[in-house]
Amino acid sequence: MRLGVLKEPEGETRVAIVPKSLRKLSKSGFEVVVESNAGITANHYDSEYEENGAIVSNRTEVVKSPLIISIHLPDVSELHAGQVIACVAD
């Protein structure tokens, strides 16, 4: 299953998945697609995600994933029917 990781809004310094978690997800059968610069504010770079098996892409591609994970609830206008969203909805 494809799992999308979104870049958080301005002011958020966390990222939903750090690069070292990717190998375990891959072994569990997930293909992880990370929005470019998603981890930058948490000091995780695109190259780290790629080195650990993720595909780094643009937001348009990431939100096509059937499973989305983020800290904040994404803009619902970007989502489609049947998607599963895992987030911390404050």
Each language-model region and where it sits:
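An N-terminal-biased, well-structured beta-alpha scaffold segment characteristic
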Residues: 2-90
